[in-house]
């Protein structure tokens, strides 16, 4: 079972809001997901990105592959560096 960390759209028409979720690659964009690990609100200026750090790092450690957009968000939040640096 391949797992992705990706965006799931929520919110009203013309007012998008996204949840950052862990989902099976076979499920639809806004369909079934395993766990919610954060949010992204592009309506705020600047756009608000919030991660639950423990959950996000746990799923990355389990092998969840982030999409390109989520990977950039992880880098901006500083979580990608925490994941890629291995303790000595």
From Swiss-Prot:
GO molecular function, one term: structural constituent of ribosome
One GO cellular component term noted in the UniProt record for this chain: cytoplasm
UniProt key word Ribosomal protein: yes
PROSITE patterns named in the record: RIBOSOMAL_S16
Signal peptide limits: none
Cystine pairs: none
Keywords of the record: Ribonucleoprotein, Ribosomal protein
InterPro entries in alphabetical order: Ribosomal_bS16, Ribosomal_bS16_CS, Ribosomal_bS16_dom_sf
Superkingdom assignment: Bacteria
Listed GO biological process terms: translation
Family to which this protein belongs: Belongs to the bacterial ribosomal protein bS16 family.
Cross-referenced HAMAP family: Ribosomal_bS16
Name by which UniProt lists this protein: Small ribosomal subunit protein bS16
């Amino acid at each position: 079972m391949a797992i992705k960390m990706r965006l799931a759209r929520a919110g009203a028409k013309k007012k998008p809001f996204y949840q950052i979720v862990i989902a099976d690659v076979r499920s639809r964009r806004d369909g079934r997901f395993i766990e919610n690990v954060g949010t992204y609100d592009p309506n705020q200026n600047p756009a608000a990105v919030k991660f639950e750090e423990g959950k996000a790092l746990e799923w990355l450690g389990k092998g969840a592959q982030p999409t390109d957009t989520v990977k950039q968000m992880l880098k901006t939040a500083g979580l990608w560096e925490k994941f890629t640096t291995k303790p000595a």
